[in-house]
C-alpha cells in the first residue's frame, strides 16, 4: 500500500435550492393565491474518522469535493428536497488544517468521530412566504443561500502504541518484520524505509501497534529530509523504542543525535517513555558489545537492552517490557481522561 501523510483538498458545500414562484390554479377559483414552496437545503461537507485506513493516498487522486445543491421548490407549497451530505472518510489521527497550515481546525483522535465541516446553504423562500395584507400576489422568491467553500490541508499523524526511532539503517524495519505481521522493505543501506510502516505485536494474549518511523538525521526537526513530517508521527506514540546500531561508526554520538532532534522538535517527544536497545549485536564481538552497552548506559542514564533483530536474540525481553510499558501508558491516559471529564462535568 502506498503511503501519503498530507494532502491539500478543495471543499464546497451545496447551495440552497431556489424558492418557487407559483400560484394556485384550481377550477372555479379565479384568483388563486401564491403557493410557491421553499427550496431544499444544500448538502453539508462532513468528515468522519473510520477504522481500517492509515494513509491519505486516496486524496492524491481525488482532490475536489463538492456537495450537491438543494432542489428547487415547487407549486402547491412543496418544499424542494434537501441534498445528501458529502461524507469524506479519513484515518484516525488526521488533522484538518487551514490553507496556510497555521491553524488546526480539527483533530480526529477516535474511530467514529464525525463533524460537519461546511454547512450547506438553506433553501430560498418561495413566493407563498412573501404574501402579506398589502401584497396578495408576490412574485419575489429567494434564490437559496450560497455554498461555503475552502481549501484545507489534511495531515496524518499515525496513532501507535510504540514508535521505533533511530538513525537510518539502525535495524528498525528488521525489528518490525521480526515481531509483527508487517512486511517492510529491508536493505543494508540508509533510508530503505521512506514512509512510516505499521504492524501489530501479539504476545501473551495482548497486543500493541508498532510503528517504524523512517530514520532521523541531523536537522530533522527543522525539516531536513522531511524529517519534521516523520517526527510528527512520533507525537501520537505512547512509547519510543530507540534502536542503536552496534556496528555503526559512533553509537554514542548516534544516541545523542536522535535525542537532540527529539528535543528540538518539541511537542513533548523527548519526555516520552523510552526504551533503549543496542541492535545488531551479532555483528560485533562480546567485548565490544559490553563496552558499548556500558557507555550507552552512562550517557543515557538508563538500562540498555541487547538485541539482534536478524537472529531474534533479545526480542522476548524487549517485547515483554513494551507490553508492560504500554499497559501503564494506557492506564495513565485513561485516568487523565477520566479526571478531565470529571472536571468539566456540568453536574
UniProtKB/Swiss-Prot annotation:
Domain Obg: 1-159
Alphabetized CDD domains for the sequence: Obg
Gene Ontology BP annotations: ribosome biogenesis
Keywords recorded for this protein, A-Z: Cytoplasm, GTP-binding, Hydrolase, Magnesium, Metal-binding, Nucleotide-binding
Binding site for Mg(2+): 173, 193
The OBG-type G domain, residue ranges: 160-327
EC numbers on record: 3.6.5.-
Chain positions recorded as GTP binding sites: 166-173, 191-195, 212-215, 279-282, 308-310
Function: An essential GTPase which binds GTP, GDP and possibly (p)ppGpp with moderate affinity, with high nucleotide exchange rates and a fairly low GTP hydrolysis rate. Plays a role in control of the cell cycle, stress response, ribosome biogenesis and in those bacteria that undergo differentiation, in morphogenesis control.
Main location (coarse class): cytoplasm
Transmembrane segments: none
Protein name: GTPase Obg
PANTHER family the UniProt entry points to: DEVELOPMENTALLY REGULATED GTP-BINDING PROTEIN-RELATED, MITOCHONDRIAL RIBOSOME-ASSOCIATED GTPASE 2
Protein encoded by which gene: obg
Cofactor needs: Mg(2+)
Disordered: annotated segments: 124-144
Subunit structure and binding partners: Monomer.
Family: Belongs to the TRAFAC class OBG-HflX-like GTPase superfamily. OBG GTPase family.
Amino acid at each position: 500500500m502506498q503511503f501519503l501523510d498530507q494532502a491539500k483538498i478543495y471543499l464546497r458545500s451545496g447551495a440552497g435550492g431556489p424558492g418557487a414562484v407559483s400560484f394556485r390554479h384550481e377550477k372555479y377559483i379565479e384568483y388563486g393565491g401564491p403557493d410557491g414552496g421553499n427550496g431544499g437545503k444544500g448538502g453539508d461537507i462532513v468528515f468522519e474518522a473510520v477504522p481500517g485506513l492509515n494513509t491519505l493516498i486516496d486524496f492524491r487522486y481525488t482532490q475536489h469535493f463538492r456537495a450537491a445543491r438543494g432542489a428547487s421548490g415547487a407549486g402547491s407549497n412543496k418544499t424542494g428536497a434537501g441534498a445528501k451530505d458529502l461524507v469524506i472518510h479519513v484515518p484516525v489521527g488526521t488533522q484538518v488544517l487551514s490553507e496556510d497550515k497555521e491553524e488546526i481546525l480539527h483533530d480526529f483522535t477516535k474511530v467514529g468521530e464525525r463533524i460537519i465541516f461546511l454547512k450547506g446553504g438553506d433553501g430560498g423562500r418561495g413566493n407563498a412566504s412573501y404574501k402579506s395584507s398589502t401584497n396578495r400576489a408576490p412574485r419575489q422568491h429567494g434564490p437559496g443561500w450560497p455554498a461555503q467553500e475552502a481549501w484545507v490541508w489534511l495531515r496524518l499523524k499515525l496513532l501507535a502504541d510504540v514508535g521505533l526511532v533511530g538513525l537510518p539503517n539502525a535495524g528498525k524495519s528488521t525489528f518490525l518484520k521480526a515481531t509483527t505481521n508487517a512486511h517492510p522493505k529491508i536493505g543494508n543501506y540508509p533510508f530503505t524505509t521512506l514512509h512510516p510502516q505499521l504492524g501489530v505485536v501479539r504476545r501473551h494474549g495482548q497486543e500493541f501497534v508498532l510503528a517504524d518511523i523512517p530514520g532521523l538525521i541531523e536537522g530533522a526537526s527543522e525539516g531536513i529530509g522531511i524529517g519534521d513530517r516523520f517526527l510528527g508521527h512520533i507525537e501520537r506514540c505512547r512509547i519510543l523504542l530507540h534502536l542503536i546500531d552496534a556496528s555503526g561508526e559512533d553509537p554514542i554520538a548516534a544516541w545523542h543525535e536522535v535525542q537532540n532532534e527529539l528535543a528540538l522538535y518539541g511537542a513533548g517527544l523527548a519526555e516520552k517513555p523510552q526504551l533503549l536497545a543496542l541492535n545488531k549485536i551479532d555483528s560485533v564481538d562480546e567485548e565490544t558489545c559490553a563496552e558499548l552497552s556500558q557507555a550507552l548506559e552512562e550517557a543515557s542514564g538508563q538500562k540498555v537492552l541487547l538485541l539482534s533483530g536478524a537472529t531474534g536474540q533479545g526480542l522476548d525481553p524487549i517485547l515483554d517490557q513494551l507490553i508492560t510499558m504500554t499497559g501503564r501508558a494506557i492506564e495513565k491516559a485513561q485516568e487523565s481522561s477520566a479526571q478531565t471529564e470529571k472536571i468539566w462535568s456540568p453536574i
